[in-house]
């Protein structure tokens, strides 16, 4: 019996002592054996592995491993405990071979899988999908992500974990949208300002070329960033609605655009001249047409065509009144031997001239001068007749000359006849006589 007792003791000790070289195999990857307690402790890879997760990923330690997840999705660590925190440090070592004796007992024990695993039909430890079996402890606002030997409680995109709850992330605070952002639970929506359209990326905005898509302008459309402007053709101005164009009345801007008349037309204007004038190359000034030179008049062969500003005059032949006699084409003389000529001007000379309507005053318009200067004689110049309106006066400019001055602007058309008298006084021979210039002034209708 003492020999049998020794054999049983050795067999039992063989069952409980670890197999040489197999101590590290008691802990799987991700765990390390604590030699003092004999327990398998989790390895914190996030601390021991340099740059375990890179970029914008965050390292989260798990029992037996670690996860790299986006920083916007913090991991909720479930409340389950370390499977190796109990006194059991299995799996158990294989049983020692039985003592080769038919009457000695053989001791064996069943295989056990660690926490998070279960035995399949082939006696293999396989991972338990806690998410599929609904054996997790994730909050209803969270989602369960199965891992090897465990699970992770995480949040969907658009949420972040805070004190076990998934809270909505306000993406609008981080400038995800180029222009307008509207936060919604778990997501966000980007929109664009008027004049822009959302690109396919759902975030950036692109200018809309309204001139190509709508062309709202009546005349010319110019696209701008986010909008457009309408422009009008020359001669038009933009209305208050910013779209329509209305004709610009250039003639109302200034009375000096045209010398005579400004005629407005859609988008432009033109200058016109009255009959008897032609428009010059500057398209604003009018020039008189000399009908007499162009033989574009209605005078008879006996009449003389006299050109005026804007017209012409047909002047009849000079007819001298008694007792005057015609000398030449434009002079009448009273014979000295005729007693009826004693108190009459010795000669009457006919002259014609024209002035424009409203001519600025004072204006020197005609000059009168004696042809001969006699010793001891002096000359007096005056307006004998036709100046009832006091529109003229004679200014003597020298001993034998004087100038007719117009003192008031005269509006045409109008014909004026003045008798300008030159009186000759000779004290040596006691002589006094006179000569007259009968000046016919034709005032035109227009001031040009």
From Swiss-Prot:
N-glycosylated. It is found in: Secreted; Secreted, Extracellular space, Extracellular matrix. Residues 245-448 are annotated as: Interaction with LOXL1. Pfam families: cEGF, EGF_CA, Fibulin_C. One of its GO terms (cellular component) is extracellular space. Its main location: secreted. Glycans are attached at residues 283, 296. GO terms for molecular function: calcium ion binding; integrin binding; protein homodimerization activity. The keyword Secreted applies. It comes from the Eukaryota. Disulfide bonds join 46-59, 53-68, 131-144, 138-153, 155-166, 172-181, 177-190, 192-205, 211-221, 217-230, 232-245, 251-262, 258-271, 273-286, 292-305, 299-314, 320-332. Keywords: Calcium, Cell adhesion, Disulfide bond, EGF-like domain, Extracellular matrix, Glycoprotein, Repeat, Secreted, Signal. Residues 1-23 form the signal peptide. Essential for elastic fiber formation, is involved in the assembly of continuous elastin (ELN) polymer and promotes the interaction of microfibrils and ELN. Stabilizes and organizes elastic fibers in the skin, lung and vasculature. Promotes adhesion of endothelial cells through interaction of integrins and the RGD motif. Vascular ligand for integrin receptors which may play a role in vascular development and remodeling. May act as an adapter that mediates the interaction between FBN1 and ELN. Homodimer. Monomer, homodimerizes in presence of Ca(2+). Interacts with ELN. Interacts (via N-terminus) with the integrins ITGAV/ITGB3, ITGAV/ITGB5 and ITGA9/ITGB1. Interacts with FBN1 (via N-terminal domain). Forms a ternary complex with ELN and FBN1. Interacts with EFEMP2 with moderate affinity. Interacts with LOXL1. Belongs to the fibulin family. This is Fibulin-5. It comes from Rattus norvegicus. The lineage of its organism: Eukaryota, Metazoa, Chordata, Craniata, Vertebrata.
């Amino acid at each position: 019996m003492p020999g049998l007792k020794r054999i049983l003791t050795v067999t039992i000790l063989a069952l409980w002592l670890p197999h040489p070289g197999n101590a590290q195999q008691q802990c799987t990857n991700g765990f390390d054996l604590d030699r003092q307690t004999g327990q398998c402790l989790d390895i914190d890879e996030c601390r021991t592995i340099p740059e375990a997760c890179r970029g914008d990923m965050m390292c989260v330690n798990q029992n037996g491993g670690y996860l790299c997840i986006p920083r916007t999705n913090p991991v909720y660590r479930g409340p389950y405990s370390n499977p190796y925190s109990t006194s059991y440090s299995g799996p158990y070592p294989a049983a020692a071979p039985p003592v080769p004796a038919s009457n000695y007992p053989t001791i064996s024990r069943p295989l056990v899988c660690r926490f998070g695993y279960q035995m399949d039909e082939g006696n293999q430890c396989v991972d338990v999908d806690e998410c599929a079996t609904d054996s997790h402890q994730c909050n209803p606002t969270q989602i369960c992500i199965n891992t090897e030997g465990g699970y992770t409680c995480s949040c969907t995109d658009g949420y972040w974990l805070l004190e076990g709850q998934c809270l909505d992330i306000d993406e609008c605070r981080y400038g995800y949208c180029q222009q307008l952002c509207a936060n919604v639970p778990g997501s966000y929506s980007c929109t664009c300002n008027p004049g822009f359209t959302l690109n396919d990326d759902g975030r950036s905005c692109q200018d809309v070329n309204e001139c190509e898509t709508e062309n709202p302008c009546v005349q010319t459309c110019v696209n701008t960033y986010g909008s457009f402007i309408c422009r009008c053709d020359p001669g038009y101005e933009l209305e208050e609605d910013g779209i329509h164009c209305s004709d610009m009345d250039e003639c109302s801007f200034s009375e000096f655009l045209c010398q005579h008349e400004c005629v407005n037309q859609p988008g432009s204007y033109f200058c016109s001249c009255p009959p008897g004038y032609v428009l010059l190359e500057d398209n604003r000034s009018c020039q008189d047409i000399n009908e007499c030179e162009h033989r574009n008049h209605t005078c008879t062969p006996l009449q003389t065509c006299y050109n005026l500003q804007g017209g012409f005059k047909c002047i009849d032949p000079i007819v001298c009144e008694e007792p005057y006699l015609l000398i030449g084409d434009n002079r009448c003389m009273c014979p000295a031997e005729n007693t009826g000529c004693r108190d009459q001007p010795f000669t009457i000379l006919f002259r014609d001239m024209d002035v424009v309507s409203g001519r600025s005053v004072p204006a020197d318009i005609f000059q009168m001068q004696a042809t001969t200067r006699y010793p001891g004689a002096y000359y007096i110049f005056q307006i004998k007749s036709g100046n009832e309106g006091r529109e003229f006066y004679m200014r003597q400019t020298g001993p034998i000359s004087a100038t007719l001055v117009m003192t008031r602007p005269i509006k045409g058309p109008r014909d004026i006849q003045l008798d300008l008298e030159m009186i000759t006084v000779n004290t040596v021979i006691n002589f006094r006589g006179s000569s007259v210039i009968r000046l016919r002034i034709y005032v035109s209708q227009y001031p040009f």
